[in-house]
């Protein structure tokens, strides 16, 4: 899935495809920066351009904790399948000819825990996903393949 929240605190909306801008983020997302400069605490920061999480992590969390959260509830932009995202820290990868760089792990935070209303720490530490930098402009769609470079 592909998810975007238009403003801080707003619910995320699912999309079939999104436009990405190098150094700026996902068009329409709360962290998108028109200028590429830091207009707030996060906009324009390479590790806030796009976030990813593994569907397998969400499924495992739901199963182990007895929950049925939807993948969008985790507030990551992309939900992937079949690839270990932790292995992409410090590495380049592509999705539909768009180049990305894995900046750091996207650890779960207290605000996500409050939003979900259940304990997610320490269960999701080291499993919360990946923060990545968008290296070139392009469009990605649901079902596009993530390929490590």
Regions inferred by a protein language model and the residue ranges of each:
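Metal-cofactor-dependent catalytic cores
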Residues: 1-149
